[in-house]
């Protein structure tokens, strides 16, 4: 996606484009990424966190208990993503052990400036084409509708990722899908990372 952003001019010009700089990609689930932020802050290196919105809502289970169920973003009440919850609590000055519910609209309306803390920046899915996916796969499908044979009247349910594993989906993008589009939240995050210009 970095190369696709560079080729299409998303980053503008610079002496050291992102693809010419050293960077490491580390895959950590949204439940644990925030645990590494103090270490990143200690190192003082730029860190981009691309994570899933993971919208959920309270539902009654078969046993009669209230449980959090994964739902489309328009029906979401909050997120199950611990890193996003940690980030919001930090921005609001709340203790890490705070368990109050964070409304999904607070998350989806987070101002750009609130997505950066020191050398760390967080991005997650945003609305595009009138819809918002709650995962990378749904976001890519949303902005690459032609490739996935999805029309203009696509619903959030149509974007739902089914079938292949997340790894297979990503490898298909790299190896088989030259015409996919990069979701706005990824462009935004990679632009932030590119603008850190560590070498200049």
Predicted regions and their residues:
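Acidic, divalent-metal-binding catalytic cores of TOPRIM
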Residues: 1-200
């Amino acid at each position: 996606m970095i190369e696709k952003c560079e080729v299409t001019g998303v980053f503008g010009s610079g002496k050291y484009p992102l693809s010419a700089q050293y960077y490491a990609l580390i895959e950590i689930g949204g439940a644990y990424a925030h645990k590494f932020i103090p270490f990143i802050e200690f190192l003082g290196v730029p860190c981009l966190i691309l994570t899933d919105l993971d919208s959920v809502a309270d539902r009654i289970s078969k046993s009669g208990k209230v449980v959090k169920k994964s739902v489309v973003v328009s029906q979401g009440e909050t997120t199950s993503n611990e890193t996003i919850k940690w980030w919001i609590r930090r921005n609001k000055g709340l203790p890490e052990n705070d368990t109050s519910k964070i409304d999904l609209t607070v998350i989806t309306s987070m101002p750009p400036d609130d997505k950066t803390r020191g050398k760390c920046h967080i991005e997650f899915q945003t609305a595009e084409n009138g819809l918002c996916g709650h995962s990378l796969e749904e976001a890519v499908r949303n902005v690459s509708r032609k490739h996935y044979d999805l029309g203009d009247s696509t619903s959030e349910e149509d974007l739902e990722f089914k079938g292949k594993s997340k790894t297979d989906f990503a490898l298909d993008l790299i190896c088989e899908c030259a015409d996919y589009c990069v979701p706005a939240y990824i462009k935004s995050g990679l632009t932030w990372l590119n603008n850190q210009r560590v070498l200049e």
